[in-house]
Regions:
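E1/E1-like adenylate-forming module used to activate ubiquitin-like modifiers
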Residues: 1-86, 114-125
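Intrinsically disordered, low-complexity Ser/Thr-enriched
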Residues: 104-117
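Short linear functional motifs in flexible/disordered or boundary regions
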Residues: 13, 102-103
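Oxidoreductase and adenylate-handling cofactor-binding alpha/beta cores
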Residues: 88-102
Length: 125
């Protein structure tokens, strides 16, 4: 299941429910900040399966509390490319889990940073 919600409250309810039902899921999220009139952005893809779930809570990988102050996100239509990247990374992760694509790292958490054009893979199975 792909999880792409834009409110913390929905995510805080949905993630425990998926875990309770022992369902695998891939959660996507964006984080934006504005510094000197330039956008900084992070794209996050976090995978949780019945066999590998500890990282989600131990490392707070999926935001389940805090503010829904996303005015910056809602006011910047130009970040559609970041949404597309989140979706693309999630589909690639799904295909790796299903054995279609090779997965040499076995990561369950990936973050892309716009300012340095970096992909960081963590939480290996």
């Amino acid at each position: 299941m792909f999880v792409c919600v834009d409110t913390v409250a929905v995510r805080a309810w949905l993630i425990p429910e998926l875990e309770r039902r022992d369902l695998p899921f891939i959660d996507c999220g964006l984080g934006l900040s504005l510094v000197d009139d330039r956008l900084f952005g992070l794209v996050r893809v976090t995978t949780s399966t019945p066999a590998v779930r500890g990282h989600v809570h131990a490392h707070h990988r999926i935001p389940a509390s805090g503010s829904d102050n996303d005015d910056l996100y809602r006011s910047n239509i130009q970040v559609a490319d970041l949404n597309m990247l989140a979706g693309t990374l999630a589909v690639i992760q799904y295909k790796q889990l299903r054995g279609f694509y090779a997965d040499g790292e076995g990561e369950y958490h990936c973050v892309y940073a716009v300012d340095g054009n970096h992909l960081v893979n963590e939480d290996r199975a």
